[in-house]
Each structure stands twice: as C-alpha cells, then as structure tokens.
Amino acid sequence: MRINPTTSDPEVSIREKKNLGRIAQIIGPVLDVAFPPGKMPNIYNALVVKGRDTLGQEINVTCEVQQLLGNNRVRAVAMSATEGLKRGMDVVDMGNPLSVPVGGATLGRIFNVLGEPVDNLGPVDTRTTSPIHKSAPAFIELDTKLSIFETGIKVVDLLAPYRRGGKIGLFGGAGVGKTVLIMELINNIAKAHGGVSVFGGVGERTREGNDLYMEMKESGVINEQNLAESKVALVYGQMNEPPGARMRVGLTALTMAEYFRDVNEQDVLLFIDNIFRFVQAGSEVSALLGRMPSAVGYQPTLSTEMGSLQERITSTKKGSITSIQAVYVPADDLTDPAPATTFAHLDATTVLSRGLAAKGIYPAVDPLDSTSTMLQPRIVGEEHYETAQQVKQTLQRYKELQDIIAILGLDELSEEDRLTVARARKIERFLSQPFFVAEVFTGSPGKYVGLAETIRGFKLILSGEFDSLPEQAFYLVGNIDEATAKATNLEMESKLKK
C-alpha cells in the first residue's frame, strides 16, 4: 500500500523515471522492448508507451513485463490494443507493478484493469493505491476457525452453507437468476455484516456488464446520488479486450477487496464472473509468449496461476474475503483442466436449476445438487446437520416418486409416500424467499432469515406440525411464522369468497 502523489499527473511520473527503453518488436499484444545494459526492469513491472500514431492520435499503452529474454530485452504483454505502435517508440519503466486505487472512494464506480474509472463520473477521489501482485497472507495471519458465513438466504444457509473466507462456485445458465442472487448477497452482506463487495467481470459480455450496473442502480446497491453509500465496486475486463487485460482484471478486483479486508478490517464479498475466462486468458498469453502447451492446450502454469489468485482469497485475523465465482464448464466436461483446477479450491457449490426457475421458485438453487464442505455436524452442529439431511432425504424421495405420480397419480401411492410428497412440496416452496433487490418485480418486501429461524422452520415442517396447512402458504415467505399467518389469511379469503 502506498500513497501515490502522481496518480493525477502521469507526466510527472514519466519525467521522474529515467529508465527508458525502445520497442524492438511487436507481435499482436506482445511487445519486445530493449533497455540499456544494467537497466532491465523486473518481472511484472509496468511499462508505459506514449507517443502518436501515423494519424497524429495520442497513444498511451500500459504493458506488463512477463519474460527477460537476454541481450537486454524484455517481453511484455499489453493491457490495451496495440494499434498504432511502432518499432523504436520510447517505453518508460514505471519501476513497480501495476497499481490501482483502493479504499472507500472506489465504491459505486466502474474500473478497467488499470484502475482507471470508465463510468464518466470523473477521477477517483483517492491517492491511495496498491500493487496488483502480492503474496498471499502468511499462515500465521490466517484465521483458521471454521465459521459459517450467514447469508440470510434459507436454501443456502441450510443446505449448502458458505464458509467465512471461503470460495463458492456458482453454476447456472442464462436466465435462472444468477444476477439477482449475486445482488441479494451484496445487499445482505452490507446490511447484516456491514461489509462491502467487489465485482470482477472477467472476459464476459459488455452488455451483461452494463445490465448488471443498471440493475444495481435500480435496486439501490449503487447509490448514484451519494456514491459513498454504495455497497460495491465494479472492475471490468470484458471479452473484447486483449488477453493481458482479461488475465489481470481478477487481480485488480482482488487487490481492491484486500484493502477492505486488511486496512478497513471488513468482511468482503468478491465476485468473479467468470473464473474460466481468467484461465482462458492465461492460456492465450502463454501461447503468445511461446510456452509449450500442456493438457488440452492449456498453459503449463495453470495450477500455479490459479493457486496464486485463490490463495489470496482467505480469512485473516483482521477480516475476510468470501469469494463467489461463476464457473463456466466447457462442453459440460467437468474433467476439463480449467474447471477441474477450480474445483480443487472450492468450499461450496451453488447450482441454479432451470426446472425450479420454470416452476417460479426463486432463488432457483437446486437443493440436491448444491454441496458444501461446511455441512458437517462438528462444524454446523447436530441440529443443523440432521435437519439438512432430513430435508434432502424428503426431497430425494419426492424426486424418485415423480415418475410414478406422472403415470399413476397420487392416489396410487402408499399413505407414507403421500405424506412425504406433501411435506416435500411444502419444503420446496418454503425454500423460496422474497428478495430485497427483487421487490420492484415481486411486489413482496424482501426478507432476511437468520440461520436459527431457518432450522426451526424446516424442523416444524418435517415433524408434521404443519401437515394441515396448504402448500401455497409456504411460497415466497420469510420465516415459518409468516407461513402460518399467510395460511390464516388464505383461509379467511376462501371463506369470504364462499
């Protein structure tokens, strides 16, 4: 961390640095730069190329040193387009790795990989910057306690709980509610934990990035009138950008999150959408640098690159970074090296189901496919574990019986199976929940449900306490008391209709 007096005026910085090189070769986004003997920059140092192209347009390209080639030459990868660059142009060694602005002033803003705001809201009101390349926290600094990160979302907290400072994989296709779930998590961490969030858009569509920004403004996650009240900082390196930018944008987002954890001592949520694109960009850069490809054409350093990012996402004694990473699985092949390497780092998986979304059950989290390493009696306690297992068993039995019901009907089932089906349908509906960020769509006020309330509700349903209540009473409510109140209202309405 350092206070950077030159962030507002890069020209001052360039005049101060006397370490000048010249472009010797350009191959797409890769530059070879020659420096005077004894003046070689370090690996990961930022290099800046300034000048004018043949049309007189100003050029300002930042690169990152990747290899020292010998003969006083380095090979660097550009973070933006290299059109207009020529051999012989001056290159300035900045003497440090890429540094990005950090702190409260980043909230409510959109940045690119270099930490430059791209939202037309003027410069960022901070002089504190931090380099994007750092070591992971030392083991002695880590908080090794296994504690649950309560989200206030029933289906997540009960069946696939998140670990504080853990990593969660989010699997889901288009239109099943991934964005709404992400926004609700951002909202809940701000309200319940006083925490903030950082969103890293890695190699995804520009349109999706813009849609997310607009939805965040609509739902109040970003407050345009008073940016200081915003709960999230956005960092985008979209799929039209060079591989260097897509490879480093995850580190830019992580660096901003680390400041909130280490200096502000907060709980932080870090979203990475999509972690596969980080690997894909690394693969492109590796090929451009001439490295021998590994399995399925991926970079030989795949595990190292993934590990250096994931090991920085952790809980320390000061605060925590809990990361939720969208995982694209190429051709649905879970053995592909990219997702397989990612799975090794995940503590929990949240799988969104199109079938549940089609039924109108939101959040459409699949209760049987979602998993968590935290769901063990010694971590969550016997009561939580037993309740979760009974819920899963009931839903699994219902799933097995669905074919029989479709062919023969409910009447052909045994008394015990009919009771199981009735309870499973209530559980399925009780796993739905009105979200704060979806109030404008549903017309229902959002609900945050504590873990103890969640467990109590499901225990009562499993015990048969509410067998007489209609299943509709359990749909889109918060805790179990709201379900009983809704049942009373439904009964009164039906009497009035008669």
Curated annotation (Swiss-Prot):
One of its GO terms (biological process) is proton motive force-driven mitochondrial ATP synthesis. The modification Phosphothreonine is found at residue 6. Keywords: ATP synthesis, ATP-binding, CF(1), Chloroplast, Hydrogen ion transport, Ion transport, Membrane, Nucleotide-binding, Phosphoprotein, Plastid, Thylakoid, Translocase, Transport. GO terms for molecular function: ATP binding; ATP hydrolysis activity; proton-transporting ATP synthase activity, rotational mechanism. ATP binds at residues 172-179. The keyword Oxidoreductase does not apply. InterPro entries: AAA+_ATPase, ATP-synt_VA_C, ATP_synth_F1_bsu, ATPase_a/bsu_AS, ATPase_alpha/beta_chains, ATPase_F1/V1/A1_a/bsu_N, ATPase_F1/V1/A1_a/bsu_N_sf, ATPase_F1/V1/A1_a/bsu_nucl-bd. It holds the Pfam family ATP-synt_VA_C. GO terms for cellular component: chloroplast thylakoid membrane; mitochondrion; proton-transporting ATP synthase complex. It is found in: Plastid, Chloroplast thylakoid membrane. It catalyses: ATP + H2O + 4 H(+)(in) = ADP + phosphate + 5 H(+)(out). It is a peripheral membrane protein. It comes from the Eukaryota. Gene3D superfamilies: 2.40.10.170, Bovine Mitochondrial F1-atpase, Atp Synthase Beta Chain, Chain D, domain 3, P-loop containing nucleotide triphosphate hydrolases. Its EC number is 7.1.2.2. Produces ATP from ADP in the presence of a proton gradient across the membrane. The catalytic sites are hosted primarily by the beta subunits. Belongs to the ATPase alpha/beta chains family. F-type ATPases have 2 components, CF(1) - the catalytic core - and CF(0) - the membrane proton channel. CF(1) has five subunits: alpha(3), beta(3), gamma(1), delta(1), epsilon(1). CF(0) has four main subunits: a(1), b(1), b'(1) and c(9-12). This is ATP synthase subunit beta, chloroplastic.
